[in-house]
Amino acid sequence: MSNSAETTTRTLVIERVFAHPPEKLWRALTESQLLAQWLLKNDFEPVAGKRFQFQSQPMPQWDGVIKCEVMVVEPLKRLSYTWNALGLESVVLFTLAPAEGGTQLRMEQSGFRADQQQAYGGAKYGWQHFFDGLERLLAGGAA
């Protein structure tokens, strides 16, 4: 197999402006109990090098565990971790930036191989759904 075939991957990008300050978004991204309310149950700690897991709904031939490791923590700016499950080895990067009326949150999940079209489609749907849950959490004042 050629080297280029091994490294050709796709990146999913989801962006949304939230009518909330970056501090509120950052808490929702980095506090385990808040993260569980809009994303998945977890044992996350915002410490570079920390391994953690998300627990999703188990399915036939999958226990629902997403294995992760924190890569980057830049408070109020960037958060990144690996996201490994079902043969997908990817990296999730959240970037916060000032925006008119609030804070823009950009999520990039990189590492989808050409043969992982179904995983890419599932992630695209899933992250939109997760962002909707994040909006509800923030609007409810929990973060």
Residue positions per predicted region:
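Hydrophobic ligand-binding cavity/cleft-lining segments
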Residues: M1-N42
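A short small-residue
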Residues: T9-T11, M107-A114
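Hydrophobic-ligand binding "helix-grip"
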Residues: L40-F44, R51-Q53, P58-Q104, S110-F112
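Generic structural signal for secondary-structure transition and capping sites
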Residues: E23, L34, P75-R78, D132, ...
